[in-house]
């Protein structure tokens, strides 16, 4: 399969094969953990827990990318943390498997963001997305072999239109 972007370079040309692979290896379980957390806890709690991502990304960016934290970013992080605490109300939220899943998902997603930033210096967005989707499709297929349940015809219709409208909306971004 040969896909080309607008600059006529092949999309799969990269010097970061291991990073793309690692990104996908972390991205898929991150999503699976988050979706599992949504089943086990209210959506507002899972979403509030996911707001820890900017804090983790900032710490990782300082440690691994050498980025600096300036006063405005620090202020925004503190406000975000306060907002997260208001939503979660520490002491009231029950610590459960869902909470741990949401936290693990957030940590993995933070690493994915850092890896993406390092790859984005050399690879185009299309290359990053192509590798991510290719690897995740392969990994998802392997998982599906063990857990596949054929959707009903009505569900297939819904999925078709969700894909169609999602693709149309995303294509409008590039017009």
Regions from the PLM with identified roles:
Residues 1-5, 174-175:
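Conserved small/polar residues in nucleotide/adenosyl-binding loops
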Residues 4-29, 108-112, 131-146:
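Transmembrane alpha-helices of multi-pass small-molecule transport proteins
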Residues 8-33, 97-105, 150-169:
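Loop-to-transmembrane-helix transition segments
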Residues 33-50, 121-126, 172-173:
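Structural motif at transmembrane-helix junctions in multi-pass transporters
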Residues 36, 53-75, 147:
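C-terminal transmembrane-helix exit sites in multi-pass transporters
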Residues 38-41, 89-96, 146-153:
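Membrane-interface helix caps and helix-loop-helix hairpins in membrane proteins
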Residues 72-88:
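Hydrophobic transmembrane alpha-helices of multi-pass small-molecule transport proteins
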Residues 93-148:
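Transmembrane alpha-helical segments that form core, pore/gating elements
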């Amino acid at each position: 399969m040969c896909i080309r972007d607008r600059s006529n370079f092949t999309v799969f040309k990269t010097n970061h094969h291991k990073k793309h692979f690692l990104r996908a290896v972390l991205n898929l379980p991150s999503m699976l953990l988050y979706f599992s957390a949504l089943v086990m806890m209210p959506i507002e709690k899972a979403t509030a827990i996911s707001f820890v991502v900017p804090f983790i990304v900032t710490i990782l960016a300082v440690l691994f990318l050498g980025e600096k934290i300036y006063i405005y970013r620090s202020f925004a992080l503190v406000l975000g943390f306060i907002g997260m605490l208001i939503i979660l109300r520490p002491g009231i939220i029950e610590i459960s498997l869902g909470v741990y899943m949401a936290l693990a998902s957030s940590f993995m997603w933070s690493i994915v963001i850092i890896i993406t930033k390092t790859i984005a210096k050399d690879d185009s967005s299309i290359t990053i997305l192509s590798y991510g989707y290719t690897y995740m499709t392969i990994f998802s297929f392997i998982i599906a072999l063990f857990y596949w349940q054929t959707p009903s015809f009505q569900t297939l219709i819904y999925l078709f239109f969700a894909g169609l409208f999602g693709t149309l909306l995303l294509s409008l971004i590039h017009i």
